[in-house]
C-alpha cells in the first residue's frame, strides 16, 4: 500500500492539484479553508445546509475515467490512472473506521456496488471528487446567480444563504441536481438556520462575524 500511496501522491501533486476549480469549492484546495467557506455566508439571514451521503464512495471508476479523459489523456492512460485511484469493496480499509455501526452502515450501503470507487484517505480522492463535482457546482452557481443566493461546497457539505428566505433554492431542486450527478442527500443533515439561531457553517459561527463558537473556545 505504501507504493500505491506514493504513486497516488504523485498523481495528486502533478495532475490533480493543477486543475483550476471554481471559487465556491472550499475544501482540498490550496489557500482555501473552513474560514473562507464560512465567510461566504457571514451575516446572512437564512442559511440552508445539506450533506451528501457517502460522498467519496458514490464516485465510481467510470466517473474517474471520464474525468481523466476530459483532462486530455487517451483511453489507455485514463483507464490506468482511474484504476490506480479507486478500489473495490473487498479492498476497502475498514480499519479506518472505529465505530462498528458506522462500518456496518457503510458496508450495507456499498455491498451492491460492484465497480471500484474513490476511497477515503487516498491522496487522490479529494481532488478527484472536486473535479468530478465541477458540473454540479457550476449548476448550483448558475442557480445562485439567477435567484440571488450564495452557494459554497466544503467536501460533502453544501451551504446556501440569502437575506430573503424565498431566494433560497428548494430542497427538491437541490436534490434533483445532486441525484442527476450521481449523489444522494443525507436527509438527517438538512438544516435551515435563520437570524437568531446559532448559525454555524463548517464549525464556525457566521451570524455577525465569523468566529469560533464559545463551547469550542472552552475546550481549547
What are these regions (language model features)?
Residues 200-220:
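Active-site and adjacent loop segments of nucleotide-processing enzymes
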Residues 42-154, 159-194, 215:
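Conserved polymerase palm-domain catalytic core
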Residues 21-35, 143-150, 155, 216-220:
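Short alpha-helical "patches" and their helix-cap loops
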Residues 11, 125, 203:
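A residue-level signal for conserved active-site and pocket-lining positions in enzyme catalytic cores
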Residues 1:
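Polyanion/phosphate-binding surface patch
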Residues 4, 8, 21, 31, ...:
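Alpha-helix initiation and N-capping motif
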Residues 193-201:
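Flexible glycine/acidic-rich beta-alpha junction loops that bind and position SAM and/or redox cofactors
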Residues 4-56:
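Active-site-proximal segment of RNA-dependent polymerases
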Amino acid at each position: 500500500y505504501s507504493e500505491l500511496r506514493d504513486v497516488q501522491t504523485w498523481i495528486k501533486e502533478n495532475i490533480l492539484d493543477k486543475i483550476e476549480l471554481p471559487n465556491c469549492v472550499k475544501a482540498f484546495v490550496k489557500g482555501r479553508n473552513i474560514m473562507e467557506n464560512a465567510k461566504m455566508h457571514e451575516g446572512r439571514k437564512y442559511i440552508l445546509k445539506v450533506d451528501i451521503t457517502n460522498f467519496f464512495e458514490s464516485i465510481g471508476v467510470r466517473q474517474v475515467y471520464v474525468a481523466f479523459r476530459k483532462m486530455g489523456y487517451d483511453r489507455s492512460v485514463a483507464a490506468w490512472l482511474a484504476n490506480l485511484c479507486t478500489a473495490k469493496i473487498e479492498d476497502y480499509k475498514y480499519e479506518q473506521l472505529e465505530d462498528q455501526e458506522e462500518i456496518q452502515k457503510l458496508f450495507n450501503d456499498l455491498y451492491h456496488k460492484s465497480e471500484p470507487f474513490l476511497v477515503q484517505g487516498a491522496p487522490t480522492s479529494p481532488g478527484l471528487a472536486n473535479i468530478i463535482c465541477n458540473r454540479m457546482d457550476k449548476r448550483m452557481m448558475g442557480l445562485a446567480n439567477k435567484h440571488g443566493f450564495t452557494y459554497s461546497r466544503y467536501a460533502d457539505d453544501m451551504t446556501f444563504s440569502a437575506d430573503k428566505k424565498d431566494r433560497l433554492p428548494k430542497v427538491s431542486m437541490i436534490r434533483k441536481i445532486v441525484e442527476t450527478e450521481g449523489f444522494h442527500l443525507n436527509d438527517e443533515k438538512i438544516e435551515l438556520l435563520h437570524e437568531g439561531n446559532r448559525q454555524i457553517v463548517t464549525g464556525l459561527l457566521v451570524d455577525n462575524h465569523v468566529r469560533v463558537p464559545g463551547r469550542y473556545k472552552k475546550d481549547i
